[in-house]
Regions:
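Flexible inter-domain linker/hinge segments
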Residues: 48-54, 59-66, 71, 75-76
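A subset of signal/propeptide-processing and intrinsically disordered low-complexity segments
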Residues: 41, 63-65, 147
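Glycine-rich, aromatic-lined ligand/substrate-binding cores of catalytic
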Residues: 82-92, 97
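Intrinsic disorder/low-complexity segments
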Residues: 38-40, 54, 76, 88
Length: 300
């Protein structure tokens, strides 16, 4: 039995606690009284926080965690940023550079890719720096899912093949494309974002992410694949207009100027508005899908 007097003034706590005890002994309910079976805390990442979990979250944490499904988030390399990190448009010769994923600005599912790291002679020079750290080297070029470990909202992105992941831009290397799509959809869902914030702060380190439970998804796998591919198509289309992005395809070439520039811009704005509306619908559909799989009310 937990009686919440956290927000009560210190001089009033004793009296409030006595009132709550008498209320509980009479068999009456109060919103400051929380009753839970402590044995159910065994499924939680930290039993102390179990008192703050509602019934929906207790049920969610009965599902297998990512690590129990052999899906593991991993910490990556640490470089000396001013020395080794570059964006591709800063370089005139790419011979000594490899792609890296250092995290991203907030962007669900997909982001722009522009970052490189100096890896001359297979990192011989980079490794001489005291601040350099090599971690999970055998996974460094594997595709999967990447995410920035900092922030209140956990947003994940496609981690492309042959990209380094880092201590800031961490990764879930995936064994196949379908596994990557499923992880991408789940981690970007409101369910996963809410659940992980129950037991972490702003640093979503790989060990904490590995404890995140995932509902069984087999019955909705085809929907998951459809949603994630549709979202990626939309984002790639508009990110290809960003000239700082490696996937830049040219702005003028994609404007289809049949009459005037103003008309072409108006048409592009209409397409952007329509695509953004569709994107929001797909994100909501993904949220609802995972809430349904967890048997939690969509509007809770």
């Amino acid at each position: 039995v937990f009686m919440d007097v956290q927000d009560v003034n210190p001089e009033e706590k004793n009296e409030n606690l006595q009132v709550l005890i008498r209320t509980y002994n009479r068999g009456e309910d109060a919103k400051w009284i929380y009753v839970a079976k402590s044995v159910e805390f065994d499924n939680l990442p930290n039993t102390v926080i179990g008192y703050y979990f509602g019934e929906d979250m207790f049920r969610l944490f009965k599902f297998s965690s990512l690590v129990d499904r052999d899906i593991r988030a991993r910490h990556g390399f640490s470089f000396v940023a001013p020395v080794h990190n570059r964006t591709y448009f800063e370089c005139t010769n790419y011979k000594n550079y490899v792609h890296q994923y250092p995290g991203s600005f907030h962007s669900l599912f997909y982001t722009v890719y522009r970052d490189l790291v100096d890896w001359k002679n297979e990192g011989t020079i980079a490794k001489t720096w005291n601040a350099f750290r090599s971690c999970n080297e055998s996974y460094r070029y594997n595709p999967g899912v990447g995410y920035g470990k900092r922030g209140d909202i956990l947003d994940a992105h496609v981690l492309k093949k042959n990209f380094f992941f880092t201590n800031e831009g961490q990764a879930i290397p995936c064994s196949n494309e379908v596994e990557g799509e499923i992880c991408l959809c789940y981690i970007n869902s409101i369910l996963a974002q809410y659940a992980i914030n129950l037991y972490t702060g702003q640093h979503k380190i790989n060990g904490n992410l590995n404890l995140l439970p995932m509902p069984d998804y087999d019955t909705r796998q085809s929907d998951i694949e459809r949603i994630v591919n549709a979202i990626i198509d939309i984002k790639r289309k508009w990110f290809s207009l960003d000239e700082t992005n490696l996937e830049y395809h040219g702005l003028i070439a994609q404007m289809h100027i049949d009459t005037t520039i103003d008309a072409a811009l108006n048409k592009m704005q209409e397409q952007l508005t329509a695509d953004y509306t569709r994107y929001e619908e797909l994100v909501k559909e993904n949220d609802d899908l995972w809430m349904d799989l967890a048997d939690i009310d969509r509007d809770s």
